[in-house]
């Protein structure tokens, strides 16, 4: 299946690229998410008419992500969680907990933007987490998980 990308997609291409993808990936992910359109003659013509507008929107999204990165760089967020001996948490601190803590600190962050490659945090301590704000923009945030005072 050949599609036209309406935005930059990681490991696939940039705005306006015509790429061949597996039919299921195109029909079930790219098209419903608004990231691509099937490469038909009408859609190619439609895309060429709207290309400048789509490129402007992509630039605005990149600028907004850069501005959010400036706010997030150097930010330290503290999360309190119940823990037992040796700092082992009862439960874990996941992406939603981190996103809520950063949002409470004053910068809006969605759960899907928080990247935790080692999985949820299960022990108290300091962690450097990466936030994927845009396909080209990532920010580092320090998260301190401490034992909750009973």
From Swiss-Prot:
Q: A biological process (GO) annotation for this entry?
A: translation
Q: Known Pfam families for this protein?
A: Ribosomal_L9_C, Ribosomal_L9_N
**Which GO molecular function terms does the record list?**
rRNA binding; structural constituent of ribosome
Which InterPro entries would you find in this protein's record?
A: Ribosomal_bL9, Ribosomal_bL9/RNase_H1_N, Ribosomal_bL9_bac/chp, Ribosomal_bL9_C, Ribosomal_bL9_C_sf, Ribosomal_bL9_N, Ribosomal_bL9_N_sf
- What does the UniProt keyword field contain? Ribonucleoprotein, Ribosomal protein, RNA-binding, rRNA-binding
User: What SUPFAM superfamilies does the entry give?
Assistant: L9 N-domain-like, Ribosomal protein L9 C-domain
Keyword Ribosomal protein included in the entry's annotation: yes
GO cellular component annotations of the record = ribonucleoprotein complex; ribosome
| Protein family (similarity comment) | Belongs to the bacterial ribosomal protein bL9 family.
Purpose of the protein = Binds to the 23S rRNA.
Q: What is this protein called?
A: Large ribosomal subunit protein bL9
Question: What is the organism of origin for this protein?
Answer: Alkalilimnicola ehrlichii (strain ATCC BAA-1101 / DSM 17681 / MLHE-1)
Gene behind this protein: rplI
